[in-house]
Amino acid sequence: MSLHNQAPERATTRRIATVMLHTSPLDQAGIGDAGGMNTYVIESAKKMASSGVSVDIFTRATSPDLPNVVELAPGVSVRHLHAKPYQGVSKSDIPALMDQLVTDFYRHMKEVGGYELIHSHYWTSGILAKQVSGETGIPFVHTFHTTAKVKNLSLADGETPEPLSRSIGEESVVKAASAIIANTDSEAASLVSLYDACPDRVYVATPGVNLAQFKVGNGKVAARDLLGIDRDKIILTFVGRIQPHKGPDVLIRAVAEVMAHSPSLRSKVNALIIGGVSGSGTGEMEKLKNLAKWLGVSDVVKFLPPVA
């Protein structure tokens, strides 16, 4: 039996490995592949750490110069998994690097003394967790966040369908996971109906809101000043990564309707689209700007980068 097939001795401190290969918790949310999942993983890890559980978040290194370990918060570390090539790797390319990533995962695991549980996020991370779990006996739970079959059922115009290889990979993760954590009842239902997940192994954990950060107060004035917006303007916003299926064009079309119906509002309204391009929608920002110009509301619609 190889070293990889031997379950490590349990670490003296309760320790969980969280895996999110295709995006880093250190990246700015709202750009590229960094989005809501990043926030979800970070905040969940901090909460577990506050309960006495050490959490190591594993992500694929995008440069050989990145440190092996970065402390994100007390009890939470980011660990970089090194695999070549570093650059020019899309989400769909990650499975081809899996042998290298798994090997480097074992290097980290040996360093810390092992994990009691692996929690993987997104399907490519689930492939790594499935392999490590099968070789060591460490249980793994998985959160998909999105799935190929659901995305392909509701593609926006111009969006590229998710490949069959992703659906097959997701099916294998569903079968192997000790448990699957869904964010909503509808997501749980889709895993059962589309992926034949065992209902007894699917759990719904509804995401919450950090009320210490998001609360009623006097932050509106500060936010307007930060974004360079007139304090007296009526503000309409789209906040998120710029992808067709998120519907940023809906805001632009709605603003055009409002301006046509009530021209007097033109000088009183700003519509803000805040976010960066992501996924297959790399040309989406230019399309949105052209749409605003074509509808005659480019003076009302403003595009801003993500704000931390």
Annotate each language-model stretch with its function.
Residues D230-K246, I252-V255, L272:
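Conserved donor-binding/catalytic core segment of Leloir-type glycosyltransferases
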Residues G32-A34, K151-S172:
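Nucleotide-sugar donor phosphate/pyrophosphate-binding loop at the beta->alpha transition
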Residues A61-S63, P163, I168-V204, V209-L211:
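A short, active-site helix/loop in glycosyltransferases that binds the activated sugar's phosphate group
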Residues M1-V78:
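N-terminal subdomain of nucleotide-sugar transferases
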Residues K215-I229, L288:
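A short helix/loop element that forms part of the nucleotide-sugar donor recognition site in Leloir-type
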Residues I16-A17, S133-L153, P163, I181:
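Active-site proximal beta-strand in glycosyltransferases
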